Amino acid sequence: MDYRAASSNKRYYVCSKVDIEFIKDEVLSIIDYDYQQMMLQSVPNGDHQYGVGRLEKYKESEDLFCVPVFPELRYTNEIIKRLRMYRSRIMIMKNGCYSWHADSTPRIHIPIITDIDKCFMVVEDEVIRMPVSEDVYWVDTTREHTFVNTSNDNRVHIVGCVS
């Protein structure tokens, strides 16, 4: 089955190509599995935890989270900049399901580690599967959505806001 076909109603599409092995190597060099999220971009003087969770906790607007937290991730930071992402973070999802919600902006998703048969996103009434590949996915997360991991393994991906 080809999981990479674009949605017919633009809930998601492949928006770019990357060297996923390079990104994976960089991400795995800094990842800490004690966290569910690690910021890749924050505000000036922010750390890898300043910006996680609900934005209402922070005084800054989402678009101000644009300073790389890990300068050593040169290729990953270059991709984030090229795709005009902000408030980008590593998501580490254990077995479970996120709440049904809508975000204020669309999101870019770059899968790093996933079980394509047991991890999927639901946007409105459409199931979306994003395999680990060179593909980068734009997803209209302003629509109601959730993410599900039924695997016993963590799912790791990069997610970032775009306007």
Spans of features found by a protein language model:
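Short glycine/proline-enriched turns and hinge-like loops at secondary-structure junctions
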Residues: H101-S104, V123, N149-N152
